A protein has these predicted regions:
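Asp-based, Mg2+/Mn2+-dependent phosphohydrolase catalytic module
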Residues: 1-8, 104, 120-228
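Short, acidic loop-to-helix structural element flanking the phosphoryl-transfer center
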Residues: 4-5, 86-115, 121, 125
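Active-site phosphate/pyrophosphate-handling residues
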Residues: 22, 60, 101, 122, ...
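A broad detector of the eukaryotic-type serine/threonine protein kinase catalytic domain
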Residues: 67, 85, 89, 111, ...
């Protein structure tokens, strides 16, 4: 049986729109409120853990870090939200012209678009408001609006259900992180598309379930058209 045409794109904002360095800085500032500061072994271990978990919700990483100490988890999560919002206000978070052009072509082809983020609504609300002024998305899902975030399949499956995808294979998932790609793979999406401009993480992305890896987001519309 032939695969159905792509009718839905789930686009992970991590790294593709939301700068990974901004998220990392906010995470470092969040754990500093709990006594884990630059120059300590605990800080180095925590940042290594963060780097290896890139793409997962920061709240989940903080749970891993602080375990059952829920008060520290909650305090650090609130600090992360404040720090990220402050950084977004100072430096701005906008989609590149190439990304806007690519997503515009996707929409023009009649393909529905869902934006996914591993951040909470509290952290990313202002950023999402700015992005959706330029990007015509039918749905935006944050990490705290699904049962489980990346790398679980819940974000992608939730998008499929809410937008009425008749077949999981009609969905394409686009991500620049291995955890986002793993979510797409676990959901059964027909296309799992990695984006790696450096071309240094292609093997890791393949291992995470990517069916194809692009080095330029501008190639996305043509890929989706060919798959259809």
């Amino acid at each position: 049986m032939a695969s159905p045409a792509v009718s839905l794109v789930c686009y992970d904002l991590a790294s593709l729109v939301i700068d990974a360095a901004v998220v990392e800085r906010a995470f470092a500032e969040a754990i500093a409120t709990q006594g884990i500061v630059t120059g300590t072994e605990a800080y180095v271990r925590s940042m290594v853990r963060f780097d290896r978990a890139r793409g997962r919700p920061p709240a989940d990483i903080l749970h891993d870090l602080f375990g059952s100490d829920e008060s520290r988890v909650q305090a650090a999560s609130l600090a992360f939200d404040r720090s990220f919002n402050s950084a977004a206000e100072r430096f701005g978070v906008t989609a590149s012209p190439e990304t806007l052009c690519a997503l515009g072509k996707v929409a023009a082809a009649g393909i529905r678009l869902c934006l996914l983020t591993s951040l909470s609504r509290g952290a990313s609300g202002a950023v999402l408001d700015a992005i959706t002024r330029d990007v015509q998305a039918e749905l935006v899902l944050c990490a705290d609006e699904v049962p489980r975030g990346f790398p679980w399949p819940d974000p992608v499956l939730t998008a499929m259900l809410r937008l009425g995808a008749a077949d999981v294979r009609e969905t394409a998932v686009v991500s620049a992180t291995e955890n986002g790609l793993l979510s797409g793979y676990r959901s059964g999406a027909g296309l799992v598309i990695g984006v790696d401009e450096s071309r240094q993480r292609i093997p890791a992305m393949r291992d995470a379930g990517a069916t194809v890896v692009l080095d330029d987001i501008a190639a996305l519309p043509e890929l989706l058209t060919a798959a259809s």
